[in-house]
Amino acid sequence: MATYAEMQQIFDDIRGDFRYDHDLNGCLNCGICTATCPSAQFYDYSPREIVQLLWTENVEQIYDAMQEKIWACAQCMTCAARCPFKNSPGGLVAIMREVAIKHEMQSAKDVLRPFGRVMLKLITTGNQLSPDMIQPDHFPDWGPNIQKVEGDLQVLRKAIPVKTLQTVETAWEVSLKTSVEMYTIWEMTGVLKSLELMDENLFDVIEDFIDEKREDYEDWLEEQEEEDDE
């Protein structure tokens, strides 16, 4: 259990985020956000509660909500679209999650641990979603026409063999230059630092992979320079 001073520091970090004042503007207590929230239908989670806790600056209850409740949010932002006061409970939850990671809260580690393998795959290989990865049966809300599109996909690809229309065979191919640029972005924005706080072992594996990719890129650049000189 954190001390009151630690809880206060956590709240100060939440409130100090540049997005905080934009996402929190008061509360009419109308309940529209919770009534339209998909997560509220299945979990002990209420967007209105998040707004009210932050608005009243109840640091102890805010800390308690960060143990489990904030991880139930689906980040669909329906709440932000519906709120008459222009609040963004989903945006506030995003801030709270980032602060939870920054403070190495156990709740963040518990939630993110199962995604270690996915994180490794995304960072080391790519993160594209190709059309033939999609299973229409899992998304009935897309309507019946999606079945027609999916059924003709392979035929359409033969008729229009555009390389940029990715499929599973090529969707995970990422150029060396793009990979190195992404690694730099993740470093500069603190993504890799957050990963290190959550799972040091996974971070070590990914860091070694990144170093190898950067060495490969440097070798490639040298080869290009030699070819240009010739």
Model-based region annotation:
Residues 30, 36, 40-43, 53-57, ...:
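Generic N-terminal helix/loop capping motif
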Residues 4-18, 42-70, 87-152:
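Ferredoxin-type iron-sulfur electron-transfer modules in oxidoreductases and energy-metabolism complexes
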Residues 25, 53-56, 80, 219:
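Generic detector of bulky aromatic hydrophobic side chains
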Residues 149-230:
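C-terminal, charged low-complexity interaction regions
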Residues 76-82, 119-131, 164-180:
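Juxtamembrane/interfacial segments around transmembrane helices
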Residues 21-40, 68-87:
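Cysteine-centered iron-sulfur cluster-binding motifs in ferredoxin-type domains/subunits
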